[in-house]
A protein has these predicted regions:
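Short intrinsically disordered, low-complexity coil segments enriched in acidic
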Residues: 1-7, 149, 155, 177
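Thiamine diphosphate
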Residues: 1-126, 130-131
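Short, solvent-exposed polar/charged micro-motifs at secondary-structure junctions
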Residues: 52-53, 139, 166-168
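Short, charged low-complexity intrinsically disordered segments located at boundaries
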Residues: 60-62, 144, 171-177
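A structural signal for short coil/turn segments at secondary-structure junctions
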Residues: 87, 151-152
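C-terminal structured domain segments across diverse proteins
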Residues: 103-106, 138, 169
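Active-site/ligand-binding-proximal alpha/beta "capping" segment
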Residues: 123-148
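Conformationally flexible catalytic loops at phosphate/diphosphate-handling active centers
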Residues: 152-177
Length: 177
């Protein structure tokens, strides 16, 4: 919830997601909390549909985000390359899970950093934020939305199963421009 709350505090307007563990908690939070004038939340049928939807939203000027896990992130490669080439701001959250291929959806692992830094063909290096605590998740959620807007391109936000499922009290966040 901290990551989602941070992104919302930064003005997130458009969230599209496919339910894939352990990223589903972000989709559920957004469905329950991202409401208001000009805001949109939708569950789609695939990760490819999700990346293309936020590409369109980013192209239209909306602060947009999706979340997935390792196998879904692999499917977003072409869309991330297009976002980089066309300078379309968007955020993709990769909630890492253990194992290769489809992986182990209920196990934790921190293994996607290299994939997130180089998600598409060509000489592309994406900015990646990797928070380590619940409090850092809040600020990383906000920073990722702001960086995508500032630098006009995709930003990857890494999390992992244990962090995504953890609940704890944090200091009241300081909100400013």
């Amino acid at each position: 919830a901290a990551l989602s709350l941070g992104a919302t505090a930064a003005g997130l307007e458009f969230y599209v997601g496919y339910p894939i563990s352990p990223a589903t908690t972000i989709l559920i939070w957004m469905e329950n909390n991202l409401w208001g004038e000009g805001r949109f939340v939708h569950q789609v049928a695939s990760e490819i549909e999700a990346i293309n939807a936020i590409l369109g939203a980013g192209f239209a000027g909306k602060k947009s985000m999706t979340a997935t896990a390792g196998p879904g992130f692999s499917l977003m490669s072409e869309g991330l390359g297009l976002a980089w080439m066309a300078e379309i701001p968007l955020v993709v959250v990769d909630v890492q899970r253990g194992g290769p291929a489809t992986g182990l959806p209920t196990k934790s692992e921190q293994s996607d950093l290299y994939t997130c830094m180089h998600p598409a063909h060509g000489d592309i290096k994406m900015p990646v934020l990797a928070p380590g605590t619940v409090e850092e998740c809040f600020y990383a959620g906000a920073l990722s939305v702001n960086w995508a807007e500032r630098y006009q391109g995709p930003v990857i936000l890494l999390s992992e199963f244990g962090l995504a499922e953890r609940g704890e009290n944090i200091r009241r966040p300081e909100l400013s421009d």
